[in-house]
Structures are given as structure tokens and as C-alpha cells.
Amino acid sequence: MLKTKIYVTALLSFAFKIMFAQSVIQVSHFDKVIVSPHIEVTFIEGNEEKVIIENSTVSEDKINIKVNGKTLRIYLDDAKEVDKTETINENGNKVKRPVYTGTVVSATVIYKTLEELSVRGEETFVCKSVLKGEKFRLKIYGESEVYLNEVSLEELRTTIYGESNLVIKAGSVKEQKYIAYGESTVNSLAINNNTTKITVYGESNFQLNVSDEIKLTAYGEASVEYKGNPTITKGLHFGEIKINKID
């Protein structure tokens, strides 16, 4: 009897996951995406715009997928901007706990065009397709891991708040601009780049491959390792700056 109950429970759990794996939400046109905490997303270019829920530990009615203007927002109830807490009784004491912990939803976003991406939380985000165009804006909040598999851009503007990690794996960007608040890490050694402008508030590390010029302004501690033969231009800086060429 016990084995039967365990089997049924496992079967129901599996069926629950399969149901979400088959959950596809068609959406209207967008070119900007905002992802809130506890949601892990992979971005893929395609012929139709939709969101696929690959896996979830909450019921579907708690997952919000909305397009306003040309902005797609994906968020959970009680975690649109930041985590909310709930009060529970624990051994006779009232204790506040976050509504969600860890990654709750894994999703895939299929887009036609993507010009701006804003992510929040501690999840992993992967742009699998080539990001191409005149300008791409990236905003990272929290302790996220962001991977851009390939880029072909005239300009990449990135703002990082927190202790996040950005890796760009291949391609080219004519002009990079970074503003970093906190202890972020950026690795774009694998791409071709003409100029990079960096403004740091805190402690950030950059690994770059630049041909023409690196401009650096730092209010804190900044570390820059680079390949290429760019001119190094230092603006205002308070704190320790380390700039090293990689052979």
C-alpha cells in the first residue's frame, strides 16, 4: 500500500511538471523584456512571439505574463519588483519568511526583435540567439548570471546593480558602455570591440578585448584586464584602480 502511494505521488508530480512543460502563452509584439525575481529565462529568436513555461513549482495562476506597449513583463504574484514576506507561526512565534525562495519558474521567451532586457533576482539568463542591431540595452539587478552567446551590435549599453556576472561569448560590438554599482564582473574577452566606456561605483572587474580606446571612471575599486592595443583614458577615480594588459 505504501509503495502504491509513493508511486501515485511520483506520477502526479511528474504529470504536474509535464503540464507546465507544455504550457505555451502567445503574446502580442514586444521588443523589450522585464523579468522579475525567481524566474529563470532563456531567450531565442523565432518567427512567432510566445512564452513557454518549461517548469514551475507554483500554480500557473501565480505566473503573470503581460505585454504593455512593447514591453513584455514576466513576474510572480507578490514578487513583481522585490520579494514580499509572509508571517507564519513557528513553534508559537510569528516569523516573517519570503513568499518564494530560489528559482520557482524556468521559461523560454521566443522573440522576433529584442532591443532591451531587464532582469532581477539571482537567476541565470541566457540569450541563445545572436543579438543584432544598432543598439541593445541591458539592465541587471541583484545577483544574476547573464550569458549572451553571440552579439552583432553597434552599441551595447549595460547597467548593473548588485553582484551580478555578465559573460559575452562571441561576436562584435563597436561601442560598449558600462555603469556598475556594486561588485559586478564582466567578461567580453571573446568579442571584437572598438571602444569601451566604464563608470564604476563600488568594486567591479572587467575583462575586455578592445582595439581603440578604454575610458574608465571609478568611484571605488576597479580592475580592468584587456587584450588589444587601446588607448587608456582615466577620468575621475577615487580608490584603487588596476589596469593590466593580457598577453
Model region roles, listed by residue range:
Residues 1-28:
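Bacterial Sec-dependent N-terminal signal peptides
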Residues 22-120, 124-139, 150-157, 169, ...:
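Acidic (Asp/Glu) and glycine-rich low-complexity loops/linkers
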Residues 166-247:
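Short, surface-exposed interaction patches in beta-rich subdomains
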